[in-house]
């Protein structure tokens, strides 16, 4: 059973402007929004702005799927990359909201093309 659905689109140029701007501002943004593992993954890629944009879209989509819980922090939502498809780890307020909703599984898909990054998050319950 689908308990929540979130979709978000981010312009890669928006993230590129932040990364190319004043270093202190870029660092504050990255530290506030992305976990160390996310930063390491994105910074190791030539298209780092695209990778950051996709992860930012995933976090926005997750917040929408969770019903925009009060107090959720960007670092409560972490896009993980194993050997296969990306996944989304929830912590803190986001994890609490998911538990209250009865979420059994979080589905995440990311894509990027034509200067935009798109993410969709589906929250699935244990029911039929």
From Swiss-Prot:
Cofactor requirements of the protein: Mg(2+)
Pfam families associated with the record: ACPS
EC number(s) given by UniProt: 2.7.8.7
One of the GO biological process terms: fatty acid biosynthetic process
Subcellular location, record wording: Cytoplasm
GO cellular component, one term: cytoplasm
Binding, Mg(2+): 8, 60
Major place of residence: cytoplasm
DNA-binding among keywords: no
Catalytic reactions of this protein: apo-[ACP] + CoA = holo-[ACP] + adenosine 3',5'-bisphosphate + H(+)
Keywords: Cytoplasm, Fatty acid biosynthesis, Fatty acid metabolism, Lipid biosynthesis, Lipid metabolism, Magnesium, Metal-binding, Transferase
Top-tier EC class: transferase
Biological role stated in the UniProt entry: Transfers the 4'-phosphopantetheine moiety from coenzyme A to a Ser of acyl-carrier-protein.
Protein's recorded name: Holo-[acyl-carrier-protein] synthase
Species this chain originates from: Anaeromyxobacter dehalogenans (strain 2CP-C)
């Amino acid at each position: 059973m689908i308990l929540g659905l979130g979709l978000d689109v981010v312009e890669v140029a928006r993230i590129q402007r932040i990364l190319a701007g004043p270093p202190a501002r870029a660092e504050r943004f990255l530290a506030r929004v992305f976990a160390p593992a996310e930063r390491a993954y994105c910074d190791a890629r030539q298209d780092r702005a695209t990778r950051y944009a996709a992860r930012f879209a995933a976090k926005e989509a997750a917040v929408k799927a969770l019903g925009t819980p009060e107090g959720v922090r960007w670092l409560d939502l972490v896009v993980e990359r194993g050997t296969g498809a990306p996944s989304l780890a929830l912590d803190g307020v986001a994890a609490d909201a998911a538990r209250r909703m009865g979420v059994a599984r979080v589905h995440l898909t990311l894509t990027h093309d034509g200067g935009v990054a798109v993410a969709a998050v589906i929250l699935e319950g244990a029911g039929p």
